[in-house]
A protein has these predicted regions:
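Canonical WD40 repeat/beta-propeller blade segments in eukaryotic WD-repeat proteins
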Residues: 101-106, 145-153, 186-193, 229-237, ...
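Per-blade loop-tip surfaces of WD-repeat and WD-like beta-propellers in eukaryotic adaptors/scaffolds
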Residues: 126-136, 168-181, 207-229, 238-244, ...
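Conserved blade-ending motifs and adjacent loop-strand segments that build the rim/top face
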Residues: 313-319, 350-372, 409
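Loop/turn-rich, solvent-exposed surfaces of beta-rich toroidal or solenoidal domains
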Residues: 318-347
Length: 410
């Protein structure tokens, strides 16, 4: 009796995965449409592997202090397409909250909400999975525009801590909707942060204060715990419970602008990362810090060796005003001019992956004062509006600057 011939579709799953692994992405897309079994095998074993470690869109485990911000949960194949859009500058641009008076806002991004300061008022806008992706009318607000400008704000859990230009600040409980005004400094508050009951604030020319947060009759009261004489432009508590404070000075003639402060003792250590000014910094993990500097560089600093581990320079010699980290490999840098944003890959030292800036001619000299991103959207604060670049737009015109970047690096 003649044996039945084995069909290709009858092969076991491991054999199919091995064969499919030799195909390019276009061929995989065609095969995934052949039958449901091929679609499942390719999605689970191939698309998931190809999309795991992609820049900005990868689904690998992220740092614990960098939770997912995606308003839409994309499948593995869609993540690959989104990465290609980031890589080749393919996006649709929208403008929100335009204002004639020059001032800059701060933003914080979550899965469901965008928090944005408008002078002295904090507005909370709902994000949706619909085409608009952002509701212009705020769902709720904190404070009033006529109050002193909000210079910096931080949200952890359901608590917001913010500092104002007149030296005051506030702690706001989002769950109970309770506002507690605080007096933090005698001059402009440049940055704040908190971790649990520990609150930190720093002024433009005064000092850095460590506070203990107490709740009395439902209101927050900050009790001064420690004061350090130095003032800083940017501060951030370490993600290991806030045992250390990374701090960057606005100006230091000795090029020792980056410091590490022991929270318990107030002892300051100078990190060997030569820079006259650090405008913004973030903790990558409990041992490494990302810094945006006046000297046109973004640096990765290891606190264990107190040395720079890697340095990325801007191709056009612009200072780095602000940073956003995706929790894995991607770092976005907001630059000093033309509301330009650079994308860097921590796995590729020196190399700028892509640049994003608007071709529109209005207010095109503004720095990027604050930025935030998820897998499909980039929020950019200029001095006259909020720009949103939506990368979930496959048919948008590509604005690819990699040719110029390759020429600069090589």
């Amino acid at each position: 009796m003649a044996k039945e011939s084995l069909q290709f579709t009858d092969l076991d799953e491991d054999s199919l995965v091995h064969i499919f692994s030799f195909l390019n992405l276009e061929d995989l897309d065609r095969l995934a449409r052949v039958c449901h079994r091929f679609y499942i095998v390719i999605t689970v074993h191939l698309y998931s592997r190809l999309s795991a470690r992609l820049l900005q869109t990868g689904h690998q485990p992220k740092a614990a202090h960098c939770p997912s911000r995606n308003v839409i949960e994309f499948d593995f194949r869609r993540r690959i397409s989104l990465f290609e859009n980031w890589r080749y500058g393919r996006y649709a641009e929208n403008q929100f909250f335009q204002h004639r008076m020059l001032y800059f806002s701060q933003i914080m991004l979550e899965k469901r909400w965008l928090y944005m300061s408008h002078r002295g008022q904090l507005r909370v806008h709902k994000r949706t999975a619909e085409r608009g992706l952002l509701r212009v009318k705020p769902s709720w607000t904190v404070g009033a525009e006529r109050q002193s400008d909000i210079n910096w704000m931080v949200k952890k859990g359901e608590v917001i801590f913010a500092g104002r230009a007149d030296g005051s600040g506030f702690v706001y409980d989002c769950r109970k909707r309770r506002y507690s005004k605080q007096v933090l400094a005698d001059d402009i508050v440049t940055a704040v942060d908190f971790e649990g009951e520990l609150f930190v604030s720093t002024g433009k020319s005064s000092s850095t204060c460590f506070w203990t947060g107490l709740v009395e009759d439902g209101q927050y009261a900050l009790e001064r715990k420690l004061e350090v004489a130095d003032a800083y432009q940017t501060i951030k508590l370490s993600p290991d419970g806030g045992s250390r404070l990374a701090a960057g000075k606005y100006h230091d003639r000795a090029k020792s602008a980056l410091r590490l402060i022991d929270v318990e003792r107030g002892f300051s250590t100078v990190l060997n990362s030569p820079s006259r000014a650090v405008y913004h910094l973030l903790w990558k993990d409990s041992c490494t810090i990302l810094t945006g500097n006046f000297d046109t560089t973004m640096r990765l600093v290891d606190t264990r060796t107190a040395q720079d581990e890697a340095i990325w320079s801007d191709p056009y010699d612009a200072s780095v005003y602000c940073l956003d980290y995706d929790g894995a490999y991607g770092v976005l840098c907001g630059m000093k001019q033309h509301f330009r944003v650079n994308l860097y890959d921590l796995r590729a030292p020196r190399r700028c992956v892509q640049m994003y800036f608007s071709p529109r001619k209005t207010t095109n000299y503004s720095p990027v004062y604050s930025l935030a991103a998820d897998s499909s959207q980039l929020f950019i604060v200029t001095d006259h509006d909020l720009r949103v670049l939506n990368f979930d737009a496959d048919h948008a015109e590509s604005k690819d600057f990699t040719h110029d970047l390759d020429r600069w690096f090589y």
